[in-house]
Amino acid sequence: RGGGISPVVIENMNCKSLPEAPLWDGKMRGILDKYKENNTPQLIIILGQEAWASYISQEYKPDIPVLCGMISKNAILLPDSDLNVAEWEPKYIDIQEYVDKGLHLGGFLYSYDVKENIRLIHNLYPKTQNIALITDNTYGGLAMQTLVKKEMENIKDLNLILLDGRKNNIYTIVEQIKNLPDQTVILIGTWRVDVNDGYYVGNATYTMMTANPRIPTFTLASVGIGHWAIGGFSPKYRPIGSDLAKE
């Protein structure tokens, strides 16, 4: 539609839940190794958190411009193959670091504003003492958890409770929600995959909501808006295919 004539080759990494993460580095390396010398592309387009993490985790990155989409400004590098991801405490990485190092990068990033969400919570519920963060057993869930933990290091008098899908299924999460202490606010990150690699759709948040409907709930990523979450500062998600093509 944009008048381009260059051929496009599509590769799919088939990434699913977080326990597979140690394998993604090798998958990406295998894809990159297919396109060398006379087969070298003019541009690499990376879509999705898992593919992006696999690319930046490469020891050697080809000197080819990269466009990215459907990824977060915050990231974490992939773990070693012998690591138990349920106990993994990754380091927060800002994508700007790679731009500063000379990576030819463009595209569209999602930015999650933890501080603004905490400020909103405090404005509406000034007696809040605990933030219960819900994240799932995916790369995106853990990257979001890592970001929240980093941002809350500088926030005094506020305790972070992790409702972590790496260690729980929806039933154990529901029990934890039932037993949350007073003066707690729930902050929803994401919930698609649980500890058993069970996949969930929107009805999961309805189940969580009924566990303790008296607890105020906010959202980082628009999950729960319209039925559970009061509100929150979230990225503006939208189709980006045509915009990437124009880039």
Give the residues covered by each predicted segment.
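Short hydrophobic alpha-helices and adjacent helix-cap/hinge residues
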Residues: 1-247
